[in-house]
Amino acid sequence: MKLYADEPGFRTIRALATVVVSALARVEVPSAIWRKTRAGELDDAAAITLVSAFELDFHGDPDSEPRFTVVSVTGPLLVAAASEVANHGLRACDAVQLASALAVRQLDPRCGEFACFDPDLRRAAGRAGFLLVPQTT
């Protein structure tokens, strides 16, 4: 959400060169945007603009590649996420996000940063050895 709304911490997130997301972001980000609309924090036009920007980042278009590298939600990833629920007491979607990050790091150890603002997910990612972005919230 920090990529699309000027919330605390947005500058740090927007400065990231590479953004890897779980395929769940396809639902989570628009959900967060529309939740802000229902709460009166955004009007419909702003929400449509933000969702469109997210869609472009997620899918790309004929003139640009997607901004995100997307991790598919597979059976083995869900098994790993279930372990993260047991290990850290995470909510289901947060466990999938952490399992996705762990899978990427296993393939490329240079992927050692984890951007997150949810305190429970941040704590779990830190315990899993990720460098947290931003360093403080």
Question: What label would you give each PLM region?
Answer:
Residues 7, 23, 75, 118-119:
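Alpha-helix N-cap/helix-start capping motif
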Residues 22, 103-137:
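Acidic, PIN/NYN-like endoribonuclease modules and their adjacent C-terminal/linker elements
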Residues 21, 72, 92-95, 116:
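Short beta-strand scaffold positions
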Residues 25, 77, 97, 120-121:
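Alpha-helix capping/helix-boundary segments
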Residues 15-19, 84-89:
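A short glycine/serine-rich beta->alpha loop
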Residues 55-88, 95-100:
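Acidic catalytic patch
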Residues 39-41, 60-65, 103-110:
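Alpha-helix termini
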Residues 1-26, 31-50, 136:
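Short, well-structured N-terminal submotif of metal-dependent ribonuclease cores
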